[in-house]
């Protein structure tokens, strides 16, 4: 018998109502002074939802409107289509694609109008932002300057698909999304320092812990922890709790320099589906309420350099081969991958040479 102790798995139930309360259009209306300027397009048309769910990405090509994403490609020997690609197209069952200019022209125009009003924007649906799809844009961020960038970012995101298809997954009162209305949020773009974003866990109206959202090491954070906690205490107890209908939730905040203001980035369900970052959910669930209502929670920070985290780009696992992700963190792995690549190219050249000799 091993003497190792095991921690009992603590159940953390979440209801559909709690998830709905974390929808941006719900909570942002309660705290307008603490959120960036944004435009919310409510009750998105079904055709737009189908557009996001369909295979491939169909971008609109408007007359008298130039976009780098829809410029005509001049065919040459390097990019010309092969005969087998044409054959595959004819053999594939025809499926009518949803096109923005045809199927939801009014929404398309509203998106363009919002961009004209706000300038660059960062999009999100009811709950999720497409942070996993930034690889598809040249700037590698969620910053969208034109409507086609919005379409690319939303179409390429697994997080967006989760909102559309599995929004209530894990809810104790059912996960059916029938009749759910979806909103598109366009938040005015601002460059935020990821080191100054924090996630706060509130259980039964008490703060039980807080953590960095960006898991890299920043040497100046520790000496500012008391300042951060004072601002977190203030926004949770004086701003959020008096109006928010639930007493347990996970709050994301941003505290920019000179550290005298705090903004709400998001409100998430108090549930395992929300990333606990530097904590574990069992750890959070097991924290007892404070005695005499005096809160003394931990603001957990990365306390030492972690070269692995610095070398890895957030969500990079979503869009490049795992071999490359691992190689980027290990110089020896890079050399090994390069050698394998050279061997593959050499083998390919030999096979092509052999095929040419057989043909002659």
From Swiss-Prot:
Any one biological process term the GO annotation gives: eukaryotic translation initiation factor 2 complex assembly
Knockout or disruption consequences: Inviable.
GO terms under cellular component: cytoplasm
Impact reported for residue 252 to A: Disrupts assembly of the eIF2 complex
Induction record: Expressed during exponential growth and repressed in stationary phase (at protein level). Levels not affected by the presence of mating pheromone (at protein level).
Stretches of the chain forming a coiled coil according to its record: none
Annotated ATP binding sites: 124, 127, 129, 131, 187, 189-190, 197, 199, 213, 252, 266, 268
A GO MF term: magnesium ion binding
Binding site for Mg(2+): 266, 268
Key words, A-Z: ATP-binding, Chaperone, Cytoplasm, Magnesium, Metal-binding, Nucleotide-binding
Consequence recorded when altering residue 283 to K: Abnormal translation initiation. Sensitive to high temperature
Superkingdom of the source species: Eukaryota
Keyword Metal-binding: yes
Pfam family, one: D123
Effect on the protein upon substituting residue 274 to A: Reduces the interaction with DMA1
Cell compartments where the protein resides: Cytoplasm
Magnesium listed as a keyword: yes
PANTHER family: CELL DIVISION CYCLE PROTEIN 123 HOMOLOG, D123 PROTEIN
Subunit structure as annotated in this protein's UniProt entry: Interacts with the eIF2 complex gamma subunit GCD11 (via C-terminus); the interaction is direct and appears to be specific for an unassembled form of GCD11. Interacts with the eIF2 complex alpha subunit SUI2; the interaction is direct. Interacts with the eIF2 beta complex subunit SUI3. Interacts with DMA1. Interacts with DMA2.
Miscellaneous information on this protein: Present with 4850 molecules/cell in log phase SD medium.
Assigned protein family: Belongs to the CDC123 family.
Function field: ATP-dependent protein-folding chaperone for the eIF2 complex. Binds to the gamma subunit of the eIF2 complex which allows the subunit to assemble with the alpha and beta subunits.
Protein name as catalogued: Translation initiation factor eIF2 assembly protein
Species annotation: Saccharomyces cerevisiae (strain ATCC 204508 / S288c) (Baker's yeast)
